[in-house]
């Protein structure tokens, strides 16, 4: 006999994915340490752990999509909780980048004697901010406008237009990533070239990683939009992707102004 549910909350069924994800993370961590210290079997254990994590992510998110789209477990109350949770996740990401900017300004506002007492450090040839960095700024801002276009299309019930807008967003994101990779390849300094190289590649590389994650997030949203999963009443997944993408936009603006422009003067 099925008991009636007298509340708006989603009580999830028992799932094997939390423990499988934990085992994958353990294997990845141990394998990574073994690989870095050249222990036999480290690379295999690291690869196995990563595969396990990716598989767990796929099947876990698949179950969440089933629960929300097909089974109707994501009520208004559940959706509100998901929104609050994702906002807190973005706040935690802000703290990550705050630490990177702190390291950059700590090093640049009071340059140590080891780097010549100047910023950029002596011997460092910086990148021109008005070449690829400025072009990437325009591309990323355009992608932010495109994802907003997709949001308005979803709210208006225009499914095809939303798909087109998401495709445009993803294409712009891929172009941005390509230019970023080109910039890294052509950079006249490396991550080991003083504190400048360390903070530059750490901050911009971490941002680039977020761009890749956000691109995958938007691709999934585009597929779901094409399949008719997203409606104007229920599109929390897309909202989370859009918020994440706007966060990536804002971080890039800070990176461009502080590290590329001001930090290269």
Curated annotation (Swiss-Prot):
GO BP: any one term: mitochondrial electron transport, cytochrome c to oxygen
InterPro entries: Cyt_c/ubiquinol_Oxase_su3, Cyt_c_oxase_su3_dom, Cyt_c_oxidase-like_su3, Cyt_c_oxidase_su3-like_sf, Cyt_c_oxidase_su3_a-hlx
Enzyme class: translocase
Location of this chain's protein in the cell: Mitochondrion inner membrane
Gene3D superfamilies registered for this protein in UniProt: 1.10.287.70, Cytochrome c oxidase, subunit III, four-helix bundle
Transmembrane parts of this sequence: 41-61, 85-105, 137-157, 162-182, 200-220, 245-265
Cellular component per GO, a single term: mitochondrion
UniProt keywords, alphabetically: Membrane, Mitochondrion, Mitochondrion inner membrane, Translocase, Transmembrane, Transmembrane helix
Listed Pfam families: COX3
Its membrane topology: Multi-pass membrane protein
Family: Belongs to the cytochrome c oxidase subunit 3 family.
Miscellaneous comment text of the record: A stretch of 270 kb of the mitochondrial genome is duplicated within the centromere of chromosome 2 resulting in the duplication of the gene. The expression of this duplicated gene (At2g07687) is not demonstrated. It is also probably not RNA edited and therefore differs in all the positions known to be edited.
Subunit and interaction comment: Component of the cytochrome c oxidase (complex IV, CIV), a multisubunit enzyme composed of a catalytic core of 3 subunits and several supernumerary subunits. The complex exists as a monomer or a dimer and forms supercomplexes (SCs) in the inner mitochondrial membrane with ubiquinol-cytochrome c oxidoreductase (cytochrome b-c1 complex, complex III, CIII).
Protein's name according to its UniProt entry: Cytochrome c oxidase subunit 3
